[in-house]
Amino acid sequence: MKPYLKNLTVAIALVASTGFSQIKDLDFNAVESKVIEWRHHIHQNPELSNREFKTAEYVAAHLKSLGIEVQTGVAHTGVVGILKGKRKGKVVALRADMDALPVTERNDLPYKSEVVSKFNGQETGVMHACGHDTHVAILMGVAEILSQNKDFAGTVKFIFQPAEEGSPPGEEGGAKLMVKEGVLENPKVDAIFGLHINSGTHVGKITYKPGGMMAASQRFVINIKGKQAHGSTPWQSVDPIVASAQIINGLQTLISRE
């Protein structure tokens, strides 16, 4: 946890023109233990997209305890914290996603999720299987560190985003709705950073690239209509199963060759 806290804090320092010497001596060790505790709590209490009510309350309460200006109810359950430095400067935003997945946890951990909810009309377990519990806890830690070190130029926006995994059918949500509701305005954001933990990256390391990264997936539906016929005259029918199989194979070829 500590390397992530340092990396995010240093990123803000660089963009906001804060000297690294001002923040490198902060007590990351003290905050690290809190971040682990927060992560365990969030992991044990996961919530699905657009339903992150308790997670939002947990985050908002922490930010308020630090004296940070807090906005709630952004894009349904999103939370935004605003921390102003002692001098004027750029506005830097940090973003973490909050929602969990409809997955039943099979780990044997003291903080494992036992939560059960409804997803697409079916009962399912709920689990932070994509690391969002860690993202939230890290950003809460960065907020605490910076709130104790306000001698920087500019403003920091802490954006806790709901519904990164996709809104429920028929609902708006996620980053798109947050932007629509003005999360990048008042004050206008000059730069924004997001992170995602990765088991393939060594502890203490970060990876980055120019241009797009952490792209979202999209969903679409293909309806295939067949034509019924008697079993003795299959040539008079249109078999939707065979057609579906061909389409699936063709789409998979696109993915593997691009």
Describe each model-derived feature in a short phrase:
Residues 115-127, 133-134, 145, 152-258:
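Histidine/acidic-residue-rich, glycine-tolerant segments that coordinate divalent metal ions
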Residues 3, 7-8, 40, 133-136, ...:
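Hydrophobic alpha-helical segments, especially transmembrane helices
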Residues 1-23:
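Bacterial Sec-dependent N-terminal signal peptides
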Residues 22-127, 137-153:
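Acidic/His- and Gly-rich active-site-bordering loop/insert found
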Residues 3-6, 24-26, 98, 148, ...:
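Intrinsic-disorder/low-complexity regions
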Residues 16-17, 142, 240:
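Alpha-helical transmembrane segments and their juxtamembrane interfaces
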Residues 2, 11-13, 71, 84, ...:
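Generic marker of residues within folded, mature protein domains
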